[in-house]
């Protein structure tokens, strides 16, 4: 099991792209999916951060209203599916709101010991046609417990879905996500990133460390960055060499 990506919900995608580029990240335009559109910050270790926003500010207000009057809570009680998770994204606060694990067999994941008592939503297949004509296909399932991760399984090569090449080179030297601290105990474990339960964080909160090759440190946080909490840190392997 691997960490695939983190979801960062923002109020305005163009603003988010500009602000993260100002911090030295290369941001790659994504696409549209229903009422949302996205962009990606892709790293050399096959992890990425997805910046996602509603295309319409009116839709954002409508989603918040539905949440406020309890319609979404009622839907969540009546039906646990992937759509409920997406509605939570679109109606909730900005920031790092979810994490996705990558597996090769989601049916086996659903019956693994850490998740057998939680259960997964029914699988949903996705398909996207790239401008170069390639067809990208993948399947998503989510843990029934909202603050647990959702899962992706690729039906086509991973580099069809996650861009490769120069888009993974960042002026700030970012190499990849190395640690995610969570306000809730997350299961199952992954082998490519350290997932740490931090009881000082609010349930559902995420704090991310990204290692870089420039021996630099930075803390990206606050309202200007959509209440996210990202730490840019030196690569410990480089420090060991010195």
Place the predicted regions along the sequence by residue:
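Short acidic/glycine-enriched loop/turn segments that link adjacent beta-strands
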Residues: 34-37, 202
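Glyoxalase I/VOC metalloenzyme domain signal
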Residues: 1-3, 8-28, 43-242
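Short glycine-biased active-site loop of nucleotidyltransferases that positions the nucleotide triphosphate
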Residues: 32, 39-43
